[in-house]
Amino acid sequence: MALTKAELAEALFEQLGMSKRDAKDTVEVFFEEIRKALESGEQVKLSGFGNFDLRDKNERPGRNPKTGEDIPITARRVVTFRPGQKLKARVENIKVEK
């Protein structure tokens, strides 16, 4: 199961006593600020959590798995996430259920 924006808003509502509307708006503003920073080429650093970076990938050869045809994969910019030390430490010893 994945954590959703709606669940984040619900946590703000329950733990901080915000109205549901304000909690939803807060979550939206938070993610919009991250999007804006990345769109303008900035790194996003969230202390104790991790960093979002932009990385330029060069064009490279690829292959269509159905046809076997060689197809170039175009150059593009991607968002990467590097977890911080505190986040790594917290998830390091969690048992994974299958």
Swiss-Prot record:
It comes from the Bacteria. This is Integration host factor subunit alpha. GO terms for cellular component: cytosol. InterPro entries: Hist_DNA-bd, Histone-like_DNA-bd_CS, IHF-like_DNA-bd_dom_sf, IHF_alpha. The keyword Transcription applies. GO terms for molecular function: DNA binding; structural constituent of chromatin. It comes from Vibrio cholerae serotype O1 (strain ATCC 39315 / El Tor Inaba N16961). Heterodimer of an alpha and a beta chain. Gene3D superfamilies: IHF-like DNA-binding proteins. Residues 53-69 have a biased composition (Basic and acidic residues).
